[in-house]
Amino acid sequence: GVGEIAISDHRSSHPTEEELIRIASQARMGGLLSGKAGIVHLHMGDYESGLDMIMDIVKKTAIPSSQFIPTHINRTSRLLDQGIEFCRMGGRIDLTAGFEENENSPDCIPTWRALNICLDSGVDIDNISMSSDGNGSVPVFDEYGNIQSIGAASCQVLFGDLKRMIEKCNIPIDIGLRTVTINPARILRIDNRKGAIRTGYDADCVLLDENLNICAVFARGKNVLTF
């Protein structure tokens, strides 16, 4: 696969439509030859063009919508609306945990609210995943586009947002869990060993107590962390 390729973002290298068609075609062919997903992973910025170019590519070429995975789709309400439309075209979207409305991102949609919006709009839960962007850069710009500071995204927000979905937003635990387990495994075509607890799978497990607090972590069947 290829990624992340930034589009609709002032930090992007601004690939043309023809460049993205070529990249997606090569990723798809590489995936077919190697038995892998060949995904093109897209970093979505907040510019108003959003997913326009990707949806145009899907409409005018033979490249299936499932070849693209746009992440940060809850960055703005308009982008989320486009993501919902993209799902109706057969695509899949990735929500970013830890996104909150603030002075620098007033139109940002928290994951729990974004998931509810998607489900209420008829999006199949199987087409939604959630990731943390853990350790990714978190820059702060002034009104003129000058960078003021930069930090790193937390990995902890993924579980925090999952827990909030279940506890405060009445999202059933089996629905919320799919966004961080079987759904990303299927997108990456590693669901023959990841994303579920089944015979022959890798036995990567996070055990929770009755209050949904993490009490143990297993990786390939070995206890690597206990609280």
Residue ranges and their predicted role:
Residues 1-13:
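Metal-cofactor-binding active-site regions of metalloenzymes
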Residues 210-212:
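Short, small/polar residue-rich loop motifs at catalytic or cofactor-binding pockets
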Residues 217:
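Short aromatic-centered micro-motifs
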